[in-house]
């Protein structure tokens, strides 16, 4: 009888401990992010997003792993580099380290190219932000989902985010318990040369990265060189669905207006023309336009729950292979926000 009780206790602990462990896997904050370093980050291996969790204006900044400056190198940029090796060795033997450091530039090629940001989705809430309380935002590392939530006039508002690898899309869901719903403007901007248009509840953005750039420490007035006929190109799609309210396409400024919806779904997809390190991204680039349109079509054909479940299942297949035990933490300490 005693052994049976012990068995049931152990069995219960087996199911309870993962729940406790999962709760402790959250990065939790009680105010919106002000700087990049304070933002929460999600990604699917191709696209990444930083989440600021703003109340009046929420920003979600995106990048793409293939959005770099540069083009394929057609020749050896330093064919005579080997001639500098004896000089560098001699300078080192004479302990002339400054001279050796200067001489080693002769064996280097061009400056490496740089990563470039894709752009930022801004959700500007047009409602009065007075009466907001109980603000929380978190990233659950256990299932790679993030949330911002707070009370407004005693009614719960939530923003949920995840970056799906199976469906190659970033998904955002806004929900409000307020019967008047959500009233907001959505826009997408990029620091790169680009054009935007809106149609059928979708913002479409096309642009291109620099074909060459210098490091940030390089003294030059123009560190980035752009040409629409060169460099990696991209297309970003932002699709919006209002479950029970209205969606208006603002053609004049390429924005989307949401009004009176208690639930809004947003999908973000991006594809670049990168087709390999040795392929010209314009002349031999991938058909990024058709790829991103197909990707979006597939994603919006699935329910939010189906996308989320597939994402979590895929993520946990890899993440749950390892667990790190850092010991016990007092409950009052564990309840504190991460930055406290």
Predicted regions located by residue number:
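N-terminal secretory signal peptides that target proteins for export/translocation
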Residues: 1-4
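Sec-dependent N-terminal signal peptides
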Residues: 6-17
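Sec/Tat signal peptide C-region and signal peptidase I cleavage site
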Residues: 18-22
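Aromatic-residue-lined binding/catalytic grooves and analogous aromatic/hydrophobic interfacial grooves
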Residues: 23-340
């Amino acid at each position: 009888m005693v052994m049976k009780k012990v068995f049931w206790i152990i069995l219960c602990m087996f199911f309870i401990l993962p729940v406790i462990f999962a709760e402790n896997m959250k990065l939790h904050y009680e105010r919106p992010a002000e700087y990049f370093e304070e933002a929460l980050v999600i990604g699917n291996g191709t696209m990444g997003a930083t989440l600021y969790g703003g109340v009046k204006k929420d920003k979600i900044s995106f990048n793409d792993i293939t959005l770099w400056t540069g083009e394929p190198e057609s020749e050896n940029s330093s064919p005579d580099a080997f001639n500098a090796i004896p000089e560098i060795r001699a300078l080192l033997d004479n302990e002339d380290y400054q001279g050796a450091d200067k001489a080693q530039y002769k064996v280097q090629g061009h400056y490496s190219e740089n990563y470039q940001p894709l752009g930022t989705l801004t959700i500007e809430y047009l409602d009065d932000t007075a009466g907001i309380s109980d603000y929380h935002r978190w990233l659950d590392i256990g299932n790679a989902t993030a949330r911002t939530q707070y009370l407004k006039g005693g009614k719960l508002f939530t923003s949920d985010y995840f970056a799906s690898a199976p469906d190659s899309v970033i998904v955002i869901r806004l929900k409000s318990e307020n019967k008047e719903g959500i009233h907001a403007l959505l826009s997408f901007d990029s620091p790169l040369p680009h054009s935007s248009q809106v149609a059928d509840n979708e913002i479409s953005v096309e642009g291109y990265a620099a074909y060459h750039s210098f490091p940030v420490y390089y003294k030059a007035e123009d560190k980035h060189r752009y040409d629409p006929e060169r460099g990696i190109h991209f297309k970003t799609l932002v699709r919006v669905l209002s479950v029970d309210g209205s969606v208006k396409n603002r053609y004049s400024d390429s924005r989307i207006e949401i009004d009176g919806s208690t639930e809004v779904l947003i999908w973000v997809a991006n594809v670049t023309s990168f087709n390999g390190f040795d392929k010209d991204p314009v002349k031999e680039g991938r058909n990024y336009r058709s790829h991103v349109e197909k990707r979006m079509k597939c994603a919006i054909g699935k329910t939010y729950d189906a996308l989320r479940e597939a994402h979590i299942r895929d993520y946990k297949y890899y993440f749950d292979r390892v667990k790190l035990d850092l010991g016990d933490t007092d409950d009052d300490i564990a309840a504190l926000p991460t930055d406290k």
